[in-house]
Each structure stands twice: as C-alpha cells, then as structure tokens.
Amino acid sequence: MRSGVIAQKVGMTRVFTDAGEHVPVTVLKVDQCQVVAHRTVEKNGYVALQVGVGKAKVKNVSKAERGRFAIAKVEPKRKLAEFRVSEDALIPVGAEITADHFIPGQFVDVTGITTGKGFAGGMKRWNFGGLRASHGVSISHRSIGSTGGRQDPGKTFKNKKMPGHLGVERVTTQNLRVVRTDPERGLILVEGAVPGVAGGWIHVRDAVKRKLPAEAPMPGKFRELADGAAPAGAVQAAQAAPEAPAAEENA
C-alpha cells in the first residue's frame, strides 16, 4: 500500500483524446509535497507517512512544529496529513513526492471539503419534490411537507431530513481515472469532478477498490535532496527552536 499526496485544486478544463473525444478533467497541483516524519509499529503502533505541502511562514508555526520540521530538515509546511502505508512503501524523510507518483490510466480516490452553500431548503439539500404548483397549495410550494410527527410518537425523530446547512463536509470520490501527469509543473489531471473549491486541499491516494497497475512505481516516485542541502526554511526553524539547557556539573 503506497502513500498518497496532498494536492491543491486548480480548476477544471478538458483534454482531447487521439480519437478527438473531449474528456473533462480536474487539474490538481502538487507543490513540494515532502515526507516530514515516519510512523512505525514500534513507536506508534502503526505504519504511516506524514507528508506536508506548500510553504508556511515561520512566524505562523508553533515552536514544537518548528522543531519537528528542523529535525526532518524540511521547510515549514502549510498542510500536513498522514497516509497509512505498508512497511515496504516507506519513503525517506525529506524526500519530495512528485506528480508522476501516479501513472496515466490508474484509478485514484480523492478526498476534499465540499463547497459551502449556506442554509438550504429541503429541495436543494435533499432533492425533495416539493408540493404541487396549484390545487390548493399556496406559499408552501418548496416546503418539505410533513415531518412524520403525530400523537404517536409525538415528536420528530433526530436526523430527519430537513432544511439546514449544506456543504463544508469531508467527501471522498472514488475511482477517478488519471488522464495525464506533468511532473515538471507538478500537475495531475484526473477525469471528472473533485469535491471542493478552487484552491482547496485535496488528498489523492491509490483507489482501494481497483488493482494497482504493475507499472506504478514502488514505493513511489520521489526525489531526494542532496546531502547537506537543507532548505532555507528548515535552517530558520532550527534557529528559532529552543535550545536544550546545559547540564550542570556536580559539586
């Protein structure tokens, strides 16, 4: 089981196949997605990778986080996430996962926060049919109708589908096909729509209900920084991290 990546939704466009058919795609940008830490069975009880993406200002990062980024020699990241992996799919700390981690033709699952719609009625929120346009109905054409309460049970049950806040929910869309990747610009083009607004953070991982293609790189496609070449942000974080107190000598 391989690691996923954190990407930023750019928007939607279309690409054309060799047969001249157009395919609607969502463009996802992977911006310096680096491995920040490992989770191991011995220390944490499970195996996972903590990855970060984007750049965060050092002043907006807590001292504890600065220390962790300094240990990993990674610039402070805007967004962090964990992905469960198998023990043979661990990627070195500090390595940058590139867009060609996924190959064209494979299927992925994407997770994002849906667009907020505010307070919505039952017809928009739950696809209710509403009431009749005439025949004695006035004013209440878009109402939900009866909520099911009568003398018994004498109340409306919890979780009844009613008007309320719509959107801003964590949603996973499964089995989206990867149409194209551009590792130089860090772009992944997936077929179809992806939940969330433009600029929102999206988690992309191998589809759990589809077999991983044999051509997919294991443990993943990544590039490592040169030895001793720590990012500038990591150096600033190390300088800002608190120093350990000096040990006192016994008299």
Curated annotation (Swiss-Prot):
Keywords: Methylation, Ribonucleoprotein, Ribosomal protein, RNA-binding, rRNA-binding
Disulfide cross-links: none
UniProt keyword Magnesium present: no
Modified residues (N5-methylglutamine): 151
Region entry Disordered, spans: 140-162, 229-251
Family, as annotated: Belongs to the universal ribosomal protein uL3 family.
Subunit structure: Part of the 50S ribosomal subunit. Forms a cluster with proteins L14 and L19.
The protein's role, per its UniProt record: One of the primary rRNA binding proteins, it binds directly near the 3'-end of the 23S rRNA, where it nucleates assembly of the 50S subunit.
Protein name: Large ribosomal subunit protein uL3
Organism name: Methylobacterium nodulans (strain LMG 21967 / CNCM I-2342 / ORS 2060)
